[in-house]
Amino acid sequence: MPVEEFERELNERREQGLYVTIRKIGSPQGAWIIVDGKKVLNLSSNNYLGFANHPRLKEAAKKGIDDYGAGPAAVRTIAGDQLPQEKLEEMLAEFKGAEAAVLYQSGFCANLGTIPALVGEGDAIFSDELNHASIIDGCRLSRAKIIRYPHLNVQTLEELLKQERQNYKKAMIITDGVFSMDGDIAPMDKLADLADKYQCILYVDDAHGEGVLGDSGRGIVDYFGLQGRVDVEIGTLSKAFGVVGGFAAGSKLLAELLKQKARPLLFSSAPTAADVYASMEAVRILQESDELVKKLWENANYFKEHMRKAGFDLGNSQTPITPVMIGDEITTQEFSKKLFERNVFAQAISYPTVPKGKARMRVMISATHSRDDLDFAVEQFTAVGKELGVIQS
């Protein structure tokens, strides 16, 4: 493709309000950060519990480097496991109430590796239409038949299962647990009933449930009390855990199979000891206390209450993920720009991350935010919302 084609496509994205600008971060993650040289209130991070700059995690990461060096330097199946990797897998399995867990380099890799290891040609995947990009890509790589059902629509899903299930050897029902752009929650109890009834693998990506839902942030399976009924629970270490990495939790046989077949595990180096040690410390903190999880929910509920009073449409959010619905892509980009001028860092989310005409500001609340921070955020959102005609003056 000629360079002129690259330029044409980039110009089209700018004209349509779809061009993404990556800001420069000059500080650790926290309630306030330095962005492009400016101190701003951070409403863009997945750092739900403040672990990304937690002193205990930083000390643990340093110890990991001291004990095992900067990196593993090889694939686990070739050069072997460093002992902390196995220890973290055991801790994650216990935390999730599963028999075993398998560690990946990221949550994205976890889906890319796990889905094709479980289903393939001649099988079917029943997938929520708003599932994360990593699920979509993992499904495509599997070469299984992908059958999409309307978002959260269990009735239509069952109709599709009645029509299609008998045509395939294996079938999987796959869903996000918490949907990252809307903050709503999958009806896992009903999906578990359908998986039992139609003999399907039940697979959930709990990236935004860990550290948020369930007892001490154990996630969506714990939240619904479905231990033993969900076959695969995908997790990430890059959101509430504040580090980087991913994992799949489930039965011992699942873990054994993934270590034989999951390509990101077989063909890419393992996570670093620094990441592993920090992740273990995050699990320990959550096992010790649910104080940070409670603070997260207090902050989220306070912010939503005052944003709704100001007249904003927050969609159907059931979690700290707070979409501020705007619709028009260009207006949404302008909204983000004006907030930044007012020292608030909240990113515009538009196509292809969400459907065209569904652009929104996505606000991520953290346990590290103070009440003053939240009041400041509502004040600035209200001022910009009135200026741009998103809410009434």
UniProtKB/Swiss-Prot annotation:
Reaction(s) this enzyme catalyzes, per UniProt: 6-carboxyhexanoyl-[ACP] + L-alanine + H(+) = (8S)-8-amino-7-oxononanoate + holo-[ACP] + CO2
GO BP term (any one): biotin biosynthetic process
Binding site for substrate: 132, 353
Listed cofactors: pyridoxal 5'-phosphate
Alphabetical list of InterPro entries matching this protein: Aminotrans_II_pyridoxalP_BS, Aminotransferase_I/II_large, AON_synthase_class-II, AONS_Archaea/Firmicutes, AONS_Archaea/Proteobacteria, PyrdxlP-dep_Trfase, PyrdxlP-dep_Trfase_major, PyrdxlP-dep_Trfase_small
Binding site for pyridoxal 5'-phosphate: 107-108, 180, 205-208, 236-239
Keywords of this entry: Acyltransferase, Biotin biosynthesis, Pyridoxal phosphate, Transferase
Record PTM N6-(pyridoxal phosphate)lysine, positions in chain: 239
EC category: transferase
Keyword set includes Protein biosynthesis: no
The protein's Enzyme Commission number: 2.3.1.47
Pathway connected to this protein: Cofactor biosynthesis; biotin biosynthesis
GO molecular function terms attached to this record: 8-amino-7-oxononanoate synthase activity; glycine C-acetyltransferase activity; pyridoxal phosphate binding
Domain of life, per lineage: Bacteria
Family label: Belongs to the class-II pyridoxal-phosphate-dependent aminotransferase family. BioF subfamily.
Role of this protein: Catalyzes the decarboxylative condensation of pimeloyl-[acyl-carrier protein] and L-alanine to produce 8-amino-7-oxononanoate (AON), [acyl-carrier protein], and carbon dioxide.
Record text on subunit structure and interactions: Homodimer.
Name this polypeptide is given: 8-amino-7-oxononanoate synthase
